[in-house]
């Protein structure tokens, strides 16, 4: 099930509420990524404490390891990973297409060599729907081909992007048909493709709208294209998505990208950036970014962000985080991840409040001014 309530708007920015089988999600929302069934360096308890409402699981990786038999023995992903709130799973398409020369695409689906042991495997819209039914995720994504920005070292042509998008549309219908055949009680999202071409994005959305998905995602962005192209496509597509359905921007991005996405009409975001950057010592704060390995932090007694109420900022100095990073302590990665995810989730809390109070434009200006202090 999925129920979407649009509470209020401020320009194109939307304040909404998504009710799913495992709980309610207040939007706009950022969704931490748990590729293998865990958000790296975080326990479910810590995710709850920082206010995570929904997390991502990766269909492709969970299918390969631990395998569906293991997840099925736990009656789904929620019990297996000890998380009782909503979960969104991607379709596995992006990971398969990332394999490059190791895979072969046909109308039926994709044949590829397992990155785990080299076994020959096949993934199709039907198989993706079957895997996601076993995972029992609250939001299921259609199986699609993520149109690359570059093909053979040059931007994809209109013809190449059109061919890819139209196959994704045919796969969308097959995904929906299999989802319904399985009597899946959860929600299914369609994915708008079309590369950097607005007319192809419009064609994709028109085709998906006929299939009446529970929600709509924008795919194929943040795949290597210049930022101005990403924003051009985002600002074209997001306001055109059905107003009565949730809007999800896949795999994006920086704090600035999230705020720009909200301004365009996006409700849901995911990205590995806050967790991956945390492990590499790159931290996001209200007043710009912090590279904790820099020598300037060696004797700094201040918290990362004096305006932040996360466990890391309440208890530890920049000097201590610098020390942990320099000596390679696991605790450093954990404390950094707690902070970065808290920052992203707090940013979304402030965005929701600003939309409710119809001051999102002012919020956006202040956000940009604060973040413009740059990297320390």
UniProtKB/Swiss-Prot annotation:
Its EC number is 2.4.2.29. Gene3D superfamilies: Queuine tRNA-ribosyltransferase-like. The keyword Transferase applies. Binds 1 zinc ion per subunit. GO terms for cellular component: cytosol. Transmembrane segments: none annotated. It comes from the Bacteria. The keyword Membrane does not apply. Residues 251-257, 275-279 are annotated as: RNA binding. GO terms for molecular function: metal ion binding; tRNA-guanosine(34) queuine transglycosylase activity. Substrate binds at residues 90-94, 144, 193, 220. Keywords: Glycosyltransferase, Metal-binding, Queuosine biosynthesis, Transferase, tRNA processing, Zinc. InterPro entries: ArchSynthase1/Queuine_TRR, TGT, TGT-like_sf, tRNA_ribo_trans-like. Zn(2+) binds at residues 308, 310, 313, 339. Belongs to the queuine tRNA-ribosyltransferase family. Catalyzes the base-exchange of a guanine (G) residue with the queuine precursor 7-aminomethyl-7-deazaguanine (PreQ1) at position 34 (anticodon wobble position) in tRNAs with GU(N) anticodons (tRNA-Asp, -Asn, -His and -Tyr). Catalysis occurs through a double-displacement mechanism. The nucleophile active site attacks the C1' of nucleotide 34 to detach the guanine base from the RNA, forming a covalent enzyme-RNA intermediate. The proton acceptor active site deprotonates the incoming PreQ1, allowing a nucleophilic attack on the C1' of the ribose to form the product. PANTHER family: QUEUINE TRNA-RIBOSYLTRANSFERASE. This is Queuine tRNA-ribosyltransferase. It comes from Cupriavidus taiwanensis (strain DSM 17343 / BCRC 17206 / CCUG 44338 / CIP 107171 / LMG 19424 / R1).
């Amino acid at each position: 099930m999925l129920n979407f309530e649009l509470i209020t708007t401020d320009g194109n920015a939307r304040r909404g509420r998504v009710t799913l089988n495992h709980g309610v999600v207040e939007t706009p929302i950022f969704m931490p990524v748990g590729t293998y069934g865990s958000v790296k360096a975080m326990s479910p308890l810590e995710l709850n404490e920082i206010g995570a409402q929904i997390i991502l699981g990766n269909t492709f990786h969970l299918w390969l390891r631990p395998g569906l038999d293991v997840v099925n023995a736990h009656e789904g992903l929620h019990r297996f990973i000890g998380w009782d709130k909503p979960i969104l799973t991607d379709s596995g398409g992006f990971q398969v297409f990332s394999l490059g020369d190791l895979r072969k695409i046909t109308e039926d689906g994709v044949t590829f060599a397992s990155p785990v042991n080299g076994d020959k495997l096949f993934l199709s819209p039907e198989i993706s729907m079957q895997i996601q039914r076993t995972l029992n995720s609250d939001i299921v994504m259609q199986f699609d081909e993520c149109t690359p920005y570059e093909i053979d070292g040059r931007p994809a042509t209109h013809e190449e992007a059109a061919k890819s998008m139209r196959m994704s549309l045919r796969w969308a219908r097959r995904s929906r048909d299999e989802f319904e055949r399985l009597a899946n009680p959860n929600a299914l999202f369609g994915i708008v493709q079309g590369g950097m071409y607005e007319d192809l994005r419009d064609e994709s959305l028109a085709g998906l709208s006929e299939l009446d998905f529970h929600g709509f995602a924008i795919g194929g962005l943040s795949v290597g294209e210049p930022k101005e192209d990403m924003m051009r496509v985002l600002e074209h597509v997001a306001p055109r998505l059905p107003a009565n359905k949730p809007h999800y921007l896949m795999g994006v991005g920086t704090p600035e990208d999230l705020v720009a996405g909200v301004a365009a009409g996006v409700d849901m975001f995911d990205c590995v950036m806050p967790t991956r950057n945390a492990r590499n010592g790159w931290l996001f704060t209200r007043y710009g970014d912090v590279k904790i390995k820099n020598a300037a932090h060696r004797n700094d007694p201040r918290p990362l962000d004096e305006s932040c109420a996360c466990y890391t900022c309440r208890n530890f100095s920049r000097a201590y985080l610098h020390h942990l990073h320099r000596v390679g302590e696991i605790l450093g990665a954990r404390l950094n991840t707690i902070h970065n995810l808290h920052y992203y989730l707090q940013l979304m809390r402030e965005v929701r409040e600003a939309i409710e109070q119809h001051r999102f434009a002012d919020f956006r200006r202040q956000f940009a001014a604060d973040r413009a202090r740059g990297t320390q």
